[in-house]
């Protein structure tokens, strides 16, 4: 505690005997200000940890009351070192913030008290109706609350606002209903008034002309609508009547209100802005009239613009609407004279481009282009979709990428000689220029220091008049003004004098390529010899000598080494500072590496990974043939795996090695040909261009940002550069291709790229600000839309008609013709080779079948095996089965069960070889002694587990029962040729070992994690738009924000990996035959490489194993370890276990005690609120009915609005409704339908296609079902289903669930120990160990919060835990306290009928700290709290919490031995 803070506590009478004093005494006063005139004090306090709320309020009250008593005011701000905050503490501080703002902003308090607030993980989420959210909360209140929280130390808390859609909808309907009723009332009153007037007035004489009829009026109205003036949306900023818009519908939502009215909300854009629109329809008949309101249509609309009170934005209430035609851009050139785009990006160019590859190819095909190239930045992730789309569209896709080309090694010394570093004389120089181009910009200062042995022996400093006024940017950057250069020596004289000054010396510059390049360009221009003596680049010297430094610029280096740099960017100061650094480097390179000679710097200091710091240059690479495709895949892989540094880099030597089959283009303004031309002129550019197969030129508009960057003077200079590029190509007889650098399709799409790019922040090179201060802005982005041939010819019209046609059309077509069609995605499945895989699968299958069912096999078994093996072996699937079997077997040997997912349990072969426990045969009896069996094939039982117990008719042994009646067709299709997708649930604890098993079985070079591509999500896109709006002073109405967010969403943002998917490449091929590889999320330290392609793009070509982690196998293993009971011995038809699904008696409690009428709390598959409700409605009594429930709960539109209603109305029972997908096929075959038709109906229904297929096809199925007496309710039920769960998946899950349930009934303490150790997500030890009353009270508290929509996610998780805690306590078991010497790190401990919680259950104590604490106590007893903190790794807050809970007993703060710690 600082003395000042100690004095303050004393003055405000802070009680020193309170526990709060021990917490607050770590504080200090950082600063204090006194405003005497106002008698106001302002403190800045600092604390190590966030104060507990009790301590904070005590301090706050005493501070204010003390100053109030002196007639003074006090305010303060708190800084906290460790801002770790638990749930309850954050809630307390949030309430404090509301109370603070209550007096000055009462509306905040009243508003927040009626809104849903969720608090968790240092974040606060406010749920509010849309009309409050957009204006009041976000703009006014959130910032105020954040300020209060920041002042008390919670500067890291994020506050977000989420729309409460249910509340928004209710309010909006109420508003509209009220508005309609008011309108109807007004109309009624008007009619009554009119009728009264008519009745009281004399009847007028008949008119000579006839009154217009309704049809005439309507036609006039339509005519006026058709001829009405169209208003641009951007011009409408207030309420107006009878406005007419034309635009594109980009979003439609339709819903029916409680009163039966239909509201159509849709959004329209004319690309100047967007509007939300609304049309109310009285019923479904009227709805037909508005069929044109569909996403993608162009419409003309007329209506009234009103301010919507819910969204607080202008909305059009539509009166008239009609669909209109819209003519998209077309390519106007004749057939055969259309260009090929060779430089186009898709949304797979990370955070840089907008169109999907499908949109790009569709546009090219629509325009009649013969081909189009894909050149995303450094990746080929759009290739698979582009390949399939091009085939479908009938257009050639040219596959390429825009690579980041780097030099292999960047030298430190140019023109090196054999010189001793310490003996040489150096001229350390720097130049200042009007820009970065040695061709287009001028020298304005040359300064140098001649140095020998660390001393300056002579200096050179001359300004140069460029002959024109310096730009404000140049002056701002360099500090050089027109007055500096006015009257300076002529350039040629300065150059000559400088050459004389440099004679006999080694030249030195920081980033020497720039300075030397500028000097040589000017020497050449004036016929002077170019630099030939050695040149040291101190930038590269520093990069190689100090690779651990992140920054090697002149500023950071001078600061690090304490070298003065008073005026950075004035040449004389920069040169002297560079010289001082040089001699530090010479000293360090000798001390670190023993290097003394100039030549050694390149040969011994330049590292092999100097490419990491090398400047990246773009080059476009194109696949010319199949060899080129594989080589490109290798290059992409190497750039991501071996040469990744910030971006994926390709060293030139690597490109040379794999260049076969690849065409190399010179790329854009970031390519080295363009850069050399700009910086050094045509001659040097010709030398560089020799490396490339063709030269790219782009429309002048693409290069326009270079003007803003002061790299090029004007548009005329751009046109000259393009002509110079053509000259470079002509000298080398290389073709010139005009390319568009496409980043979006249409000109109006530019805003989408603008938003995406600006979201990268100023740290991104493309967003580097031009200028300084408030006016600094990034350079504008180029106009990079996809241009038609005629648009491209217009861009290059300045070259003349013939030359423009040559580079735009003729050369691009000729280059496209040189490129062969390639196969990007293979047609077939290529599985790995395992010796004798087919024989092994067949042998294992029959061996197990003989063991269980006897030899010879029953016909039904024999035929099923023969059928399955014919498919599995005939289609090359044996290796997939065998690999899965090997993985499952290895996990079993480690002591874990493995659960199957999906439909693999439909395969009897999979059952026999041990991949799945699910037996798909019809229900049957099986004798474990003599192998006799009896099969029930009439459909009377849905599961063999439900068969009544029975003794073997042959030997009298009690039969085993099995069989779930699942057809094989549901796994591999009716013809058995569908690639098997075997998903397996391994224990989460064993999952890493299972992953490594794949490597072990197939080889590390053949096993890769399944890659994923992360794109900009909808909510993120919305945030990008709002951020752009804020940062660039824009204003968009809500509909326009939504439109822009939709345009931005879907752009690639990062890469990742599937949580359990592993792709296996066949060992007779290599991975580059299918995909490049990389590390997930560009993390080169990751343990696994991933497929570069999204794994879904190649999942039909290679084996993919889903090795997922799951809690069920972990929990089963825990229960087995606790009890010694083999889970495989647990019967699936235990009568006591089945009682859980119909009541609570088997647990020894009443429904009132545990708050639910069944005993399924905490049982996998059945313990959620939703499924518990289903259980309570249906009371299942058989395994088959549990399968039904599992299917019903996982399906979409299978239970709600479907089976639930059928059961309630008594039309069907739980047993007869459609539950799992396989049941449809089995039921229909039992009914008499042809198996093929039964299978097809099942497939149509399970995928939600029943109502989407043609009416003719559907009626054929209905007729067949009715002919076989399938009831109408069953047929109608099929039509409602959107998705169905596989029965095999349900069976695997239910079998696991019943094993867990067995322990809950028969070995409850083991069950609760396992549940809390593995499944529980949240704990509150104080409540859990305080007894039943405390638990029930806390549950009631959370229930009330839930009703007010105020319960946090953590509280919702805690409620689930407390339900099980309550049940456990009601059954007579208890929770003990944490015990410093008994508690485990992560798992609960059984002590009689009591569970001792682990350390991890203590709020704020993580797994690593818990393990450290357990390890520390093994070393010896903790003698003091200080020792506990140090050895156990606990924070002061955690130690205090343990102390408050009574866990530390009378442990002293310090022990005597600790007094001597500081001496060691």
UniProtKB/Swiss-Prot annotation:
CDD domains: DEDDh, PHP_PolIIIA_POLC, polC_OBF. Keywords: Cytoplasm, DNA replication, DNA-directed DNA polymerase, Exonuclease, Hydrolase, Nuclease, Nucleotidyltransferase, Transferase. Required for replicative DNA synthesis. This DNA polymerase also exhibits 3' to 5' exonuclease activity. It catalyses: DNA(n) + a 2'-deoxyribonucleoside 5'-triphosphate = DNA(n+1) + diphosphate. The keyword DNA damage does not apply. Belongs to the DNA polymerase type-C family. PolC subfamily. Gene3D superfamilies: 1.10.150.870, 3.30.1900.20, 6.10.140.1510, Metal-dependent hydrolases, Nucleic acid-binding proteins, PolC, middle finger domain, Ribonuclease H-like superfamily/Ribonuclease H. Pfam families: DNA_pol3_a_NI (PF14480), DNA_pol3_a_NII (PF11490), DNA_pol3_alpha (PF07733), DNA_pol3_finger (PF17657), HHH_6 (PF14579), PHP (PF02811), RNase_T (PF00929). Residues 426-582 form the Exonuclease domain. It comes from the Bacteria. Its EC number is 2.7.7.7. The gene is polC. It is found in: Cytoplasm. One of its GO terms (cellular component) is cytoplasm. This is DNA polymerase III PolC-type. GO terms for molecular function: 3'-5' exonuclease activity; DNA binding; DNA-directed DNA polymerase activity. It comes from Streptococcus thermophilus (strain ATCC BAA-491 / LMD-9). One of its GO terms (biological process) is DNA-templated DNA replication.
């Amino acid at each position: 505690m600082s003395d000042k803070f100690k004095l303050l506590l004393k003055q405000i009478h802070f009680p020193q005997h309170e526990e709060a004093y021990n917490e607050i005494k770590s504080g200090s006063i950082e600063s204090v200000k006194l405003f005497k005139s106002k008698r106001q004090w302002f403190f800045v306090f600092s604390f190590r940890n966030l104060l507990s709320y009790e301590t904070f309020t005590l301090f706050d009250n005493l501070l204010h009351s003390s100053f109030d008593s002196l007639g003074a005011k006090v305010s303060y701000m708190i800084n906290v070192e460790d801002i770790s905050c638990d749930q309850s503490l954050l809630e307390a501080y949030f309430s404090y913030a509301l109370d603070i703002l209550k007096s000055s902003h009462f509306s905040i308090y009243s508003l927040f008290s009626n809104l849903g607030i969720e608090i968790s993980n240092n974040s606060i989420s406010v749920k509010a109706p849309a009309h409050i959210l957009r204006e009041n909360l976000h703009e006014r209140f959130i910032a105020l609350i954040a300020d209060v929280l920041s002042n008390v130390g919670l500067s890291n808390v994020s506050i977000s606002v989420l729309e409460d859609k249910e509340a928004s909808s209710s309010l909006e309907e109420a508003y509209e209903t009220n508005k309609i009723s008011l309108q109807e009332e007004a109309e009624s009153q008007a009619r009554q008034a009119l009728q009264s007037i008519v009745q009281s007035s004399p009847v007028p004489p008949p008119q000579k002309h006839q009154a217009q009829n309704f049809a005439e009026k309507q036609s006039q109205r339509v005519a006026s609508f058709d001829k009405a003036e169209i208003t641009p949306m951007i011009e409408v900023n207030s309420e107006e009547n009878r406005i007419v818009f034309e635009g594109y519908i980009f979003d439609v939502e339709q819903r029916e209100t409680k009163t039966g009215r239909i509201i159509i909300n849709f959004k329209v854009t004319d690309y100047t802005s967007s509007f939300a629109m609304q049309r109310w329809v009285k019923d479904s008949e009227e709805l037909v009239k508005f069929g044109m309101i569909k996403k993608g249509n162009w419409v003309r609309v007329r209506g009234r613009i009103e301010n919507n009170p819910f969204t607080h934005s202008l909305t059009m209430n539509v009166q008239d609407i009609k669909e209109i035609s819209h003519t998209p851009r077309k390519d106007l050139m004749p057939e055969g004279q259309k260009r090929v785009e060779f430089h186009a990006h898709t949304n797979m160019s990370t955070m840089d481009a907008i169109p999907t590859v499908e949109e790009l190819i569709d546009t090219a095909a629509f325009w009649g282009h013969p081909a189009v190239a894909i050149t995303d930045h450094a990746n080929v992730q759009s290739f698979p979709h582009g390949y399939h789309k091009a085939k479908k569209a009938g257009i050639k896709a040219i596959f390429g990428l825009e690579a980041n080309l780097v030099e292999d090694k960047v030298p430190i010394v140019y023109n090196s000689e054999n010189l001793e570093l310490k003996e040489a004389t150096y001229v350390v120089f720097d130049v200042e220029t009007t820009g970065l181009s040695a061709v287009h910009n001028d020298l304005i200062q040359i300064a140098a220091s001649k140095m020998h042995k660390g001393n300056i022996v002579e200096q050179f400093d001359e300004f140069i008049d460029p002959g024109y006024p310096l730009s404000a940017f140049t002056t701002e950057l360099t500090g050089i003004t027109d007055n500096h250069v006015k009257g300076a020596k002529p350039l040629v004289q300065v150059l000559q004098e400088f050459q004389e000054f440099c004679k006999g010396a080694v030249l030195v510059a920081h980033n020497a390529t720039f300075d030397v390049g500028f000097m040589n360009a000017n020497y050449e221009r004036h016929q002077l010899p170019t630099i030939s003596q050695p040149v040291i680049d101190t930038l590269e010297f520093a990069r190689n000598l100090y690779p651990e430094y992140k920054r090697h610029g002149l500023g950071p280096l001078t600061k690090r080494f304490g070298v003065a740099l008073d005026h950075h960017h004035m040449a004389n100061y920069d040169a002297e500072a560079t010289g001082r650094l040089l001699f530090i480097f010479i000293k360090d390179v000798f001390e670190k590496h023993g290097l003394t000679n100039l030549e050694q710097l390149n040969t011994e200091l330049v590292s092999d990974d100097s490419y990491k710091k090398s400047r990246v240059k773009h080059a476009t690479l194109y696949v010319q043939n199949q060899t080129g495709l594989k080589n490109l895949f290798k290059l992409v892989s190497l750039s991501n795996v071996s040469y990744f540094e910030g971006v994926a880099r390709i060293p030139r030597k690597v490109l040379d090695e794999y260049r076969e089959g690849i065409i190399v283009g010179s790329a854009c303004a970031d390519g080295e040909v363009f850069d050399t031309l700009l910086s050094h002129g045509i001659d040097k550019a010709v030398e560089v261009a020799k490396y490339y197969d063709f030269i790219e030129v782009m429309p002048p508009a693409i290069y326009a940002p270079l003007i803003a960057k002061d790299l090029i003077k004007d548009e005329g200079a751009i046109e000259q550069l393009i002509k110079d590029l053509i000259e470079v190509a002509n000298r080398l007889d290389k073709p010139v291709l005009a390319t568009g650098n496409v980043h979006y399709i249409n000109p109006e799409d530019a805003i989408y790229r603008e938003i995406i790019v600006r979201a990268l922040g100023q740290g991104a090179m493309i967003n580097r600000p031009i200028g300084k201060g408030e006016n600094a802005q990034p350079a504008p982005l180029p106009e990079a839309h996809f241009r038609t041939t005629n648009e491209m010819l217009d861009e290059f019209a300045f070259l003349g008609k013939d030359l423009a046609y040559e580079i735009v059309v003729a050369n691009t077509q000729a280059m496209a013709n040189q490129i062969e069609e390639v196969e990007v995605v293979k047609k077939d499945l290529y599985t790995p080779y395992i010796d004798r895989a087919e024989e092994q699968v067949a042998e294992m299958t029959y061996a197990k079948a003989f063991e269980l069912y006897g030899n010879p096999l029953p016909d039904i078994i024999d035929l099923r095996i023969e059928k399955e093996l014919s498919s599995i072996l005939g289609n090359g699937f044996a290796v997939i089965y065998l690999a899965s079997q090997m993985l499952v077997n290895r996990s079993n040997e480690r002591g874990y069960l493995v659960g199957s997912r999906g439909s693999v349990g439909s395969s009897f072969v999979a059952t026999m070889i041990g991949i799945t426990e699910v037996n798909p045969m019809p229900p049957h009896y099986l004798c474990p002694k003599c192998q006799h069996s009896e099969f029930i094939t009439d459909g009377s039982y849905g599961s063999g587990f439900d068969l009544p117990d029975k003794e073997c008719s042959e030997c009298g042994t009690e039969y085993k029962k099995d069989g779930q009646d699942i057809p094989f067709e549901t796994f591999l299709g009716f013809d058995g040729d569908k690639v098997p997708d075997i998903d397996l649930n391994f224990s989460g604890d064993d999952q890493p070992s299972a992953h490594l098993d794949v490597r072990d079985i197939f080889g590390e070079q053949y096993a890769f994690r399944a890659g994923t591509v992360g794109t900009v999500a909808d909510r993120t896109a919305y945030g990008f738009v709002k951020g752009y709006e804020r940062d660039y002073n824009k204003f968009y109405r809500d509909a326009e924000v939504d439109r822009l967010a939709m345009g931005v969403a879907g752009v690639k943002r990062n890469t990742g990996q599937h949580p359990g998917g592993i792709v296996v490449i066949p060992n007779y091929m290599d991975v580059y035959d299918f995909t490049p590889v990389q590390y997930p999320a560009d993390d080169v330290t990751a343990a696994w490489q991933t497929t570069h392609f999204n794994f879904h793009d190649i999942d039909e070509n290679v084996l993919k194993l889903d090795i997922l982690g799951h809690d069920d196998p972990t929990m089963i293993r825990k229960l087995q370890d606790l009890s010694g009971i083999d889970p495989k011995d647990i019967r699936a038809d235990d009568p006591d276990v089945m009682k859980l699904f119909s009541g609570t008696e088997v647990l020894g409690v009443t429904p009132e005690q545990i708050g639910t009428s069944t005993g399924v709390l905490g049982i996998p598959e059945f313990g959620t609120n939703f499924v518990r409700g289903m259980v309570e409605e249906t009371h299942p009594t058989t395994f088959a009915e549990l399968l039904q429930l599992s299917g019903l709960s996982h399906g979409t539109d299978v239970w709600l609005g479907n089976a639930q209603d059928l059961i309630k109305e008594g039309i069907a029972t739980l047993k007869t409704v459609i539950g799992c997908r396989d049941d449809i096929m089995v039921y229909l075959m039992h009914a008499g339908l042809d198996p093929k038709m039964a299978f097809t109906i099942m497939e149509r229904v399970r995928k939600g296609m029943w109502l989407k297929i043609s009416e003719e096809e559907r009626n054929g199925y209905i007729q067949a079902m009715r002919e076989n007496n399938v009831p109408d309710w069953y047929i109608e039920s099929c039509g409602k289903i959107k998705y169905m769960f596989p029965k095999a998946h349900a069976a695997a899950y239910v079998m696991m669930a019943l094993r867990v349930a067995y322990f809950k009934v028969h070995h409850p303490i083991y069950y609760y120990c396992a549940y809390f150790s593995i499944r529980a997500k949240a704990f509150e030890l104080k409540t859990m160990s305080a007894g039943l009353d405390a638990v029930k009270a806390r549950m009631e508290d959370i229930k009330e919060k839930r009703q007010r929509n105020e319960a946090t996610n953590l509280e919702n998780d805690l409620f689930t835990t407390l339900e099980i805690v309550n049940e456990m306590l009601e059954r007579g078991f208890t929770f003990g306290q944490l015990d410093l010497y008994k508690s485990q790190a992560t798992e609960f401990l059984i002590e009689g009928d009591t569970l001792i919680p682990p350390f991890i259950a203590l709020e704020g104590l993580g797994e690593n700290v818990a393990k450290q604490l357990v390890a520390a106590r093994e070393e010896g007893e903790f003698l003091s709290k200080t020792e506990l903190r140090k050895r156990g790794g606990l924070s002061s807050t955690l130690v205090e919490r343990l102390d408050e809970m009574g866990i530390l007993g009378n442990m002293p703060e310090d022990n005597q031995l600790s007094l001597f710690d500081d001496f060691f």
